[in-house]
């Protein structure tokens, strides 16, 4: 059977399906005479006739929003749901959220905290941030513009999404080698990385990073990924403590931003429209504001703080993940939402087994 015969046999199916398929994938720009995909489709002549034209049009068409950094508010049929359903946070829970610094108790705790303090210095230099003392936030030298805040968020989230994926990957490979289950650690770690990436994708809808920023993110990710990978092989408990302290710093960042919004120092940021990706992921109300969005992100970071400080207290190979399954023993237990939130983490003897 020749190629032409195969094309003719499939032409009936393609003609019946193409209008529906093209309607889902074709952009409004495809109708423009200057659009390459339209020109390619109309100028193509071959033995395949309309079949070839249809396939070429589909292959070269593009959705409205082809860039991660686009600010278009268009809705798309091809938008996929979240791999993990985000827990619902109430406004009362987020308003009452307090994150306390966990004091160091062991040598590994001190190593983790000092590593974070060093990383914080580099992070502040890269984003032009200076942390004010009590009552000094209004001074000009501590002022942060909307662009500076969004740059800081982008930098933070691009780094914060690394530990969960690295830890999850290492534990996944260990589970394969050991031929046994991981007691549900992998799921929470990968979900954490996914959550941080959703933060990043949300802020990318609000601001496109500069070339310098993207270069810095690339270099930072390469260095941080490899250092964290090696460190997790050596001492996973120390790495979880490190992430716990990292999330404490993230909470401080978003808390400071909320204070600036409330004080009227960020009118441009406060007036921005919440991206659709955020509305869907966090189940936000129709009248939500940027302040609400920052509160949701802050609550996520606080939750990661609790999870990783708890993981740092547990036996790394034999203890179960207490956030994956809640066992009722008559005492408060860790949960996926904020109902039993404890920022400094849960001690091993507090968790039901």
UniProtKB/Swiss-Prot annotation:
Segments traversing the membrane: 153-173, 217-237
Keywords: Electron transport, Iron, Membrane, Metal-binding, Mitochondrion, Mitochondrion inner membrane, Oxidoreductase, Respiratory chain, Transit peptide, Transmembrane, Transmembrane helix, Transport
Gene Ontology MF, one: alternative oxidase activity
Membrane topology: Multi-pass membrane protein
A Gene Ontology cellular-component term: mitochondrion
Enzyme class, UniProt record, top EC level: oxidoreductase
Subcellular location: Mitochondrion inner membrane
Main location: mitochondrion
Polar residues bias spans: 35-45
One Pfam family in the UniProt entry: AOX
Binding-site list for Fe cation 2: 196, 247, 301, 304
Encoding gene, per UniProt annotation: AOX
Region (Disordered): 25-45
Family of this protein: Belongs to the alternative oxidase family.
The protein's role, per its UniProt record: Catalyzes cyanide-resistant oxygen consumption. May increase respiration when the cytochrome respiratory pathway is restricted, or in response to low temperatures.
Name this protein carries in UniProt: Alternative oxidase, mitochondrial
GO biological process: alternative respiration
Entry annotated with the keyword Membrane: yes
Gene3D superfamilies: Alternative oxidase (1.20.1260.140)
PANTHER family noted in UniProt: ALTERNATIVE OXIDASE (PTHR31803:SF3)
Enzyme Commission number(s) from the entry: 1.-.-.-
